[in-house]
Swiss-Prot record:
Chain intervals with Basic and acidic residues compositional bias: 125-145
Compartments it resides in: Mitochondrion intermembrane space; Peroxisome matrix
The name this protein goes by in its record: Mitochondrial intermembrane space import and assembly protein 40 homolog
Keyword Membrane: no
Region (Disordered): 1-61, 119-162
GO biological-process terms attached to the record: protein import into mitochondrial intermembrane space; protein targeting to mitochondrion; protein targeting to peroxisome
Disulfide bonds: C68-C70, C79-C112, C89-C102
Motif range (Cx9C motif 1): 79-89
KO phenotype (gene knockout): No visible phenotype under normal growth conditions.
Gene that produces this protein: MIA40
Length: 162
């Protein structure tokens, strides 16, 4: 590879996408054709009805967030109880790093998702994007590299003093 090619390959390339943040106070638009991500669903549920009563207990806020219609499919699926437990634990978490005290419920949720791959839609779990990336990549071909003759060691004679 020449110096120009090497310099060209060392320049980092970045791709940015401008996606608007999810609306925190309104339910999802039913006309939206793209499936929302898990993060946007959870953010919407956490903010669901937040402006109604600021003096409400953490337990009541967490329960109201769980009642958000935006996560109804997640609650009612085959891993619904594990999702509800993990989500409530996260919302009620008072740890400095939010949710770090909720390892067990999230491990249970992950185990359930692994045991039931169809528990949530692929667009919610992010598997859809990984599948697309795998399909886009061309198959890797194995190549046999043969070194040039000048790079090979010369045959040794029995009279060599090396």
């Amino acid at each position: 590879m020449g110096q120009a090619q090497s310099d060209e390959n060392s320049i980092p390339t970045t791709t940015t996408t401008n996606t608007p943040p999810p609306s925190a106070n309104s339910p999802r638009d039913s006309e939206d054709t793209s499936s929302p991500s898990m993060d946007s669903l959870l953010a919407e549920a956490a903010a669901y009805g937040e402006d109604d009563n600021e003096n409400e207990s953490l337990e009541a806020k967490a329960q109201r967030a769980l009642d958000c219609p935006c996560i109804a499919d997640l609650r009612n699926g085959s891993c619904g109880s594990q999702f509800s437990e993990a989500f409530l634990c996260f919302l009620k978490s008072t740890a400095e790093e939010k949710g770090s005290d909720c390892v067990n419920p999230f491990v249970a949720l992950q185990s359930c998702i692994n045991a039931n791959p169809d528990a949530f839609s692929k667009s919610v779990t992010g598997d859809e994007k990984e599948t697309e990336k795998k399909e886009e990549q061309p198959p890797v071909q194995d190549h046999r590299i043969i070194p040039p003759l000048w790079a090979k060691d010369p045959p040794r004679s029995g009279n060599s003093k090396l």
